[in-house]
Amino acid sequence: DRLGQKSWELAESELQKTAIDLALRKGGLHRRDLDLILAGDLLNQCIGSFLASMHANVPYLGQYGACSTMAQGLALGGCLVESGAADRLLAAASSHFCSAERQYRFPLAYGGQRTPTAQWTATAAGAAVLGAEGASDVCLTHVLFGKMVELGVKDANNMGAAMAPAACDTL
């Protein structure tokens, strides 16, 4: 689960780098073809995304929206492309179960029992290229930014219950 890396955080960065490279390859593009990278993860200072993007020689804007990071990157990216602020950019997000456990809950070596309401973070990464012109039939037509809705959920492990009211209000 470390993809040959020394830590889970570096493994997460490698996952995101792989997703970025795959999205560019599928689009027949190189990093130099991008005006901006919008990328995020669940780590402090978005270190996984920073490490995945640091050698791209492309402006980078770290995104931190927890579960909404990819949607946030796509929405912001779509607005930047539509406004003419960027011609082509890439949105990416990643997470790693083990690094999230260490940062948000309990380190795995601690051996603590999970609460029944605790969420399970995916070990995954995704990336998408957005541009005003391209060969894809897939496009963003609208974006909707939600607002925070606080109903006083006290269970710190039940992130789903904390996020659900805002999702319901938005949708």
Spans of features found by a protein language model:
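Short beta-strand segments
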Residues: 39-40, 89-95
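Short active-site-adjacent helix-start/loop capping segments
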Residues: 44-49, 70, 98-101
